[in-house]
Amino acid sequence: VDNIYDGPVVSYMIGEKDFWKDTSYVSLLLNKKGDFTIQGGQHTITYETDESLADGQYYLYMFDNNIGISETRPDYDWSSIGLKVSSAVDGKNSKYYKYLVDENEGTFELVDSFKVPYSGYVSSAQETGDNVLVDSGLKGTFTEYDADHKAIVTYKMDYEKFIYRVFKYKFDGFYFEKRG
């Protein structure tokens, strides 16, 4: 979004061209680089800069619910773009997705992904160093994965509806400050 305070304008979007083809937004879409199914539903999208990237490049990572559904386009055939599930609870896998976005080239590409327990709604993903913490909200689980996408530990909660988000923070020098 450009001019966020004076008159916001959407400068570009990441989305499936086929979904947006009959709208005025299609010209705003970045080009998908590579062969992968675009995210279907997404939660906790995180913008990440990196000193190794060129100006105009950044990462976006997210919990990809892997669901094809839209209240504004109930007739859209999501299976035509690889999203075969439209149920909040009956899917097999959701995914952790990480894109490299290049504003200069007008592209986005999938640079990392792995399957996680399915959750059609809610949920979260957080990079913690080399690891990734994933909350599959409708399953009531959260798992920390190592750099090779192997589960380190999984927790399951008794819950009535779902776990909305899970985050991991260090509180060094915050609550437990050393006193001299």
Provide a role label for each language-model segment:
Residues 1-180:
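Histidine-/acidic-rich catalytic cores in large beta-rich domains
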